[in-house]
Every structure is written in C-alpha cells, then in structure tokens.
C-alpha cells in the first residue's frame, strides 16, 4: 500500500482546503452511494452505543477535501480519522472494531494476517462492491435516531444545488461524478 500523504496527526487542520469540523472524536467517511458502505456506516451507528464516532460521506465537501488532503481516491477505500491520524482499508476496520469494543474486539485476531493480504481481500471487495451489493442514486436514508452521528455539511455546500437524503447532501456535480465512475 502506498503511504498516505500528510499522514501526521491533525495535519488537515493546516490545510485551507479542508473545512473546519469537530475532530474530538473519530470520523468515518464512506461512499454514500454504495449499498455495502452505507450499510456498514449504519451498522457502525447502531453498534456505537457510546456515540464515539462521527460520520460523513466521501461525496460531501468535507469528505472530498479530506480524501484530497491525504492523496487517496474515495472510490478505492473509506477513510477513518482517529486521534488526527488516517486509517484506510483493512487496518481501519480493525481499528474501528477495537474502538467500538465489546465482542467486536475479537475481530482483532485478523491482525495475525499480514496487512498486504488483508488489504488485497479488501481491494477485491471494494472494486466489485457496486456490482455485488448495488448502488443507489441518492444517499440512503438514515434512521432519525442515528442521525446524531452525522456531520452536517449542507451549510458548506449551500452554494451548489442540493439533493438531500438522510441528513447528507450532494450537489448535482457530485452525483454526476458518482454516475461517471459506475
């Protein structure tokens, strides 16, 4: 795996292209159009009983800016930022399970598998996720009781025409970019 650019703690705070956001908790940034990814985010919201995580989509202005800051393609992986550090692919999911705690810590046994092999498996799923699990035109609806974990980026994107669903907003340009990648 190529090293992430700017992978020092809280480096995004000095990047004027990254909108300010509360970073006192980990933030999970996912593909809002991917059924598997949105399902994973909903799973995290339901199992995060202590409300440790915040969420945003890769298609939001915050998500896009953070992906650009770290030099990664949102279509290749999700992004988890915890204690100001970026995590992606299998290592990020294992870190997330450790933070969620409970019996999910049992998943940490996967650290025994070399990262290259874990990430290879992750990349196969990531490349085929739309074909295997589907894709939605608009971000899926998030139940009201779980919306508290979402970072609201609508104000940042107010200058662009919006399509909104489940508390997450996407501009026509963002929707076109998603459609072009499928």
Positions of predicted regions on the chain:
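N-terminal leader/targeting and pre-domain segments
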Residues: 2-14, 18-19
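Local sequence-structure signature of Cys/Sec-based thiol-disulfide redox active-site neighborhoods
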Residues: 16-47
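Short coil/turn segments at beta-strand junctions that form active-site/ligand-binding loops
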Residues: 24-25, 51, 76
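Active-site-adjacent beta-strand anchor residues
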Residues: 30, 56, 111
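Short cysteine/histidine-rich zinc-coordinating motifs and their immediately flanking basic loops
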Residues: 46-50, 150-152
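Thiol/selenol-based redox catalytic cores and closely related redox-interacting motifs
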Residues: 61-182
């Amino acid at each position: 795996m190529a090293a992430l650019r700017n992978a020092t703690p809280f480096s995004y705070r000095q990047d004027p292209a990254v909108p300010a956001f509360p970073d006192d908790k980990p933030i999970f940034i996912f593909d809002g159009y991917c059924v598997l990814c949105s399902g994973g985010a909903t799973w995290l919201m339901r199992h995060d009983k202590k409300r440790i995580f915040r969420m945003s989509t890769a298609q939001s202005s915050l998500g896009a800016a953070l992906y650009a800051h770290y030099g990664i393609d949102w279509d290749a992986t999700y992004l988890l930022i915890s204690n100001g550090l970026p995590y992606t692919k299998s290592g990020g999911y294992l870190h997330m399970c450790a933070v969620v705690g409970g019996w999910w810590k049992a998943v940490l046994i996967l650290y025994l598998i070399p990262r290259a092999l874990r990430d290879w498996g992750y990349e196969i799923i990531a490349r085929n996720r739309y074909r295997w699990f589907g894709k939605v035109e608009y971000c899926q609806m998030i139940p009201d009781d779980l919306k508290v974990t979402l970072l609201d980026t609508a104000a940042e994107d107010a200058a662009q025409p919006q399509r909104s669903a489940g508390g997450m907003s996407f501009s026509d340009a963002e929707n076109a970019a998603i459609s072009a990648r499928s």
